[in-house]
C-alpha cells in the first residue's frame, strides 16, 4: 500500500520534469541552429564581398587596359554571347561559393566538436 501512495508524487514529479527537459532541449537546439546560421552567414558574406571586390578590381583593370580598343570589339562580344550570360555566370558562381562555404563551416564545426 505505501508503494501506491507514492505514485501521485511520482506523476507530479514527472509532469514537472518533462516541460523542463523539453525547454532545455529546445534551447539547446536553438543555440545550435543560431550558431550554425550565424557562422554560415558570416562566411558567405565575407567570401561574397571578397569575390565582388576582386571582380570589381578585375573589371577596372580590364576597362583601363582596353581603353584603346574600339567599340567594334564590344559589339562583337555582345553579338556572340547570349542575353543572360552575366546573370547565369553570377548565379553559378554564387551557388558554388555557397556550397564551398557550407563545406568549410562543416569542417570548422567538426574540428570544434573534436576539440570540445
From Swiss-Prot:
Q: Per its UniProt record, what Pfam families does this chain match?
A: DUF5455
The UniProt entry's GO CC annotations, sorted and at most eight, read:
host cell membrane; membrane; virion component
Give the record's membrane topology.
Multi-pass membrane protein
BP terms from Gene Ontology: symbiont entry into host cell
The reply to whether DNA damage figures as a keyword in the UniProt entry is: no
Q: Where are the transmembrane segments?
A: 13-33, 38-58, 84-104
Keywords annotated in UniProt: Host membrane, Membrane, Transmembrane, Transmembrane helix, Viral penetration into host cytoplasm, Viral penetration into host cytoplasm via pilus retraction, Virion, Virus entry into host cell
Protein's UniProt keywords contain Transmembrane:
yes
Q: Which cell locations does it reside in? A: Virion; Host membrane
InterPro entries given for it?
DUF5455
**Assembly and oligomerization:** Interacts with G3P; this interaction is required for proper integration of G3P and G6P into the virion.
- Family statement: Belongs to the inovirus G6P protein family.
Q: What does this protein do?
A: Plays essential roles both in the entry of the viral genome into the bacterial host and in budding process. The formation of the G3P-G6P complex termed adsorption complex is essential for correct termination of filamentous phage assembly.
Q: What is this protein called?
A: Head virion protein G6P
Amino acid at each position: 500500500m505505501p508503494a501506491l501512495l507514492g505514485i501521485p508524487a511520482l506523476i507530479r514529479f514527472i509532469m514537472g520534469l518533462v516541460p523542463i527537459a523539453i525547454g532545455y532541449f529546445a534551447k539547446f537546439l536553438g543555440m545550435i541552429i543560431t550558431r550554425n546560421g550565424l557562422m554560415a552567414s558570416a562566411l558567405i558574406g565575407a567570401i561574397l564581398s571578397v569575390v565582388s571586390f576582386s571582380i570589381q578590381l578585375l573589371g577596372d583593370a580590364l576597362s583601363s587596359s582596353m581603353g584603346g580598343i574600339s567599340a567594334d570589339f564590344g559589339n562583337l562580344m555582345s553579338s556572340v554571347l547570349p542575353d543572360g550570360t552575366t546573370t547565369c555566370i553570377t548565379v553559378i558562381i554564387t551557388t558554388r561559393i555557397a556550397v564551398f562555404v557550407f563545406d568549410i563551416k562543416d569542417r570548422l564545426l567538426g574540428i570544434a566538436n573534436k576539440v570540445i
